[in-house]
């Protein structure tokens, strides 16, 4: 295999614009409608779902970069309950649990910064990129450098500034992958951002894929470029009202192969991978919408039953009240009749006693 020589990035080509992502495109409007319903009827379910997706992204992006390893069970616990150190046993990861949680929280905070930009609270500029890089590498103090003789050594990591030295990795078979020389990074990033502004009417997944690849071609930072690239890809998708991009650890080889294909001029494998991941995220989100519909239907049914029960109870109360009134009147009449009868008997007894004093006994 030959060395890969750097060349300036290129705008989105006509060929790349025509990449067919129909299977995912068909879900866009369905998801946008569902999102609107969720925002109006069950915003807490939508927020919880996005939160889990962001935490999954935060875990997987570091695993892709070999910053740490983490077993699946602990991964799911952290995604469900949040980044809590007590959930991580020392045997479940290859670094100290406290350090793992620090890194995960950095990566989660970086995606929150992305969401601030999506909400319009930050502009998408070089300064924003630098802030994102600082946040993503907050607990990474060093990086591995290779000198001109091929010797590897740990050096201090420069955060929030573009690289000042080449960062061209040597592959296992000995070939060199050349990224953008430091002297051209500023102008290449400016081109990338300027072209991005022209693509607002293009398929957002194609644009996100193009941006992701061109950013990795530049490799503007000393280290952390993959994490920044994936965070910025999520930014582009979320600006189009789509969902964060989560590349799972099991897809690492496919992801890297797709990036190499893009280096050779074929963006389709990477776009297809991103579309597949976005489609899976949308379908999962639609299940949240369906669950919300079921929950709403259950709530409506419960409300109808409660309303009918209330009406029945009110009618029963009215009936019972009327019955109590009737019983009271009847009791009063009985008491009045008994009194009248007793008075009549008393009068009759007195009269008879006068006429037949010794023969009449009325008790």
Question: Where are the model-predicted features located?
Answer:
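FIC/Doc superfamily catalytic core
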Residues: 1-223, 227-363
């Amino acid at each position: 295999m030959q060395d890969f020589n750097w060349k300036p990035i290129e705008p989105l080509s006509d060929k790349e614009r025509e990449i067919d992502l129909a299977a995912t495109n068909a879900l866009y409007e369905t998801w946008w409608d569902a999102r609107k319903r969720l925002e109006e009827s069950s915003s807490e379910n939508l927020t919880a779902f996005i939160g889990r997706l962001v935490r999954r992204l935060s875990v997987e992006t570091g695993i892709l970069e070999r910053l740490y390893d983490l077993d699946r069970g602990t991964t799911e616990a952290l995604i469900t309950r949040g980044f809590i150190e007590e959930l991580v046993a020392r045997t479940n990861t290859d670094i100290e649990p406290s350090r793992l949680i620090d890194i995960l929280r950095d990566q989660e905070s970086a995606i929150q910064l992305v969401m601030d930009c999506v909400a319009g609270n930050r502009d998408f500029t070089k300064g924003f990129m630098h802030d994102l890089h600082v946040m993503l590498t907050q607990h990474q103090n060093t990086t591995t450098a290779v000198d001109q003789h091929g010797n590897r050594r740990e050096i201090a990591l420069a955060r929030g500034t573009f690289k000042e030295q080449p960062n061209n990795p040597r592959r296992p078979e000995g070939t060199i992958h050349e990224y953008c020389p430091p002297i051209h990074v500023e102008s290449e990033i400016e081109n990338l951002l300027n072209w991005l502004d022209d693509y607002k009417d293009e398929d957002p997944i194609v644009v996100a894929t193009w941006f992701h690849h061109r950013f990795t071609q530049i490799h503007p930072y000393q280290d952390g470029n993959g994490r920044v690239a994936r965070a910025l890809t999520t930014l582009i998708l979320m600006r189009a009202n789509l969902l964060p991009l989560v590349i799972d650890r099991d897809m690492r080889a496919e992801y890297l192969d797709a990036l190499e294909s893009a280096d050779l001029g074929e963006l389709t494998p990477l776009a297809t991978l991103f579309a597949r991941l976005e489609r899976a995220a949308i379908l999962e989100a639609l299940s949240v919408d369906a669950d919300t519909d079921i929950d709403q239907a259950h709530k409506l049914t419960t409300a109808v039953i409660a309303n009918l029960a209330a009406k029945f109870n009110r009618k029963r109360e009215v009936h019972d009240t009327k019955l109590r009134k009737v019983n009271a009147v009847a009791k009063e009449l009985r008491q009045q009749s008994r009194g009248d009868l007793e008075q009549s008997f008393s009068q009759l007894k007195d009269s008879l006693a006068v006429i037949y004093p010794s023969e009449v006994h009325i008790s």
